[in-house]
């Protein structure tokens, strides 16, 4: 499924009005057709100007790096790709191999804490003074939305929640990692105090091998100058 959203802001330059960003999240080594041909065909049909990958391309329980690498190699033929890792990449043994050779203009090491929220706060503090334009953040974790809002991020792309795994009519998602039962941020667009966050339901599964009322999705955001 392709889910499309329009995100408007007066900070979006006129030259970027209509810019399309396609998001893939939480692949978890899933394959849709041989070498993910079906997924890539659907991705290309969205006519993205760029593609963002928001973590967990692999699954730490059944890691197959080749599936993730192959998908990335084909995705960059469609449009420029920007990638942020998720908790499953961080847990598997080949993580250093995946990072090797990645060109990152602002790579940080030596974090002041082992707590994810404190590391994230420290990182946001490092970059918050570097931009006065429209600030787009890729973060695997949607549960830190209040922190993103505190730092004035304009648009966040997140995943991790798997759409709440089992979606109940009139209720929404049943549970999500990092948020527990009846998660607050599990699907779609959230906007508060000038910060918008798009949470993808993702395309793959991890601990639970199936979904209920919760189709895998490619999320597309079209930026508009307000």
Please report, for each region that a protein language model flagged, where it lies by residue.
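Membrane-embedded segments
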Residues: 15-105
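Short, flexible loop segments at the rims of nucleotide/cofactor-binding pockets, characterized by
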Residues: 27-31, 58-62, 111-116, 134-135, ...
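Active-site-proximal beta-strand elements of phosphoester/diester hydrolases
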Residues: 18-28, 100, 106-109, 113, ...
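Solvent-exposed loop/turn segments at secondary-structure junctions
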Residues: 29, 57-60, 87-91, 108, ...
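Binuclear metal-dependent hydrolase catalytic cores centered on His/Asp/Glu-rich metal-binding motifs
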Residues: 93-135, 145-146, 151, 208-212
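Conserved beta-sheet core of the metallophosphoesterase superfamily
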Residues: 136, 141-219
């Amino acid at each position: 499924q392709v889910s499309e959203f329009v995100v408007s802001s007066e900070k979006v330059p006129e030259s970027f009005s209509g810019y399309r960003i396609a998001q893939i999240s939480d692949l978890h080594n899933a394959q849709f057709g041989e070498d993910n041909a079906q997924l890539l065909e659907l991705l290309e049909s969205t006519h993205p100007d760029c593609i963002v990958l928001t973590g967990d391309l692999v699954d730490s329980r059944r890691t197959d790096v080749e599936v993730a690498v192959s998908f990335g190699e084909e995705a960059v033929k469609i449009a420029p790709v920007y990638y942020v890792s998720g908790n499953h990449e961080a847990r598997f043994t080949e993580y250093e191999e995946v990072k090797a050779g990645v060109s990152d203009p602002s790579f940080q090491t030596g974090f002041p804490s082992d707590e994810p929220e404190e590391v994230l706060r420290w990182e946001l503090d490092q970059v918050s003074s570097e931009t006065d334009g429209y600030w787009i953040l890729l973060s695997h974790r949607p549960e830190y939305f209040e922190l993103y809002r505190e730092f004035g991020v304009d648009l966040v792309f997140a995943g991790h929640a798997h759409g709440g795994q089992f979606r109940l009519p009139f209720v929404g998602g049943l549970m999500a990692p990092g948020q527990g039962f009846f998660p607050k941020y599990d699907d779609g667009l959230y906007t508060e105090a000038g910060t918008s966050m798009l949470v993808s339901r993702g395309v793959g599964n991890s601990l639970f091998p199936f979904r209920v009322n919760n189709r895998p999705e490619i999320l597309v955001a079209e930026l508009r100058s307000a």
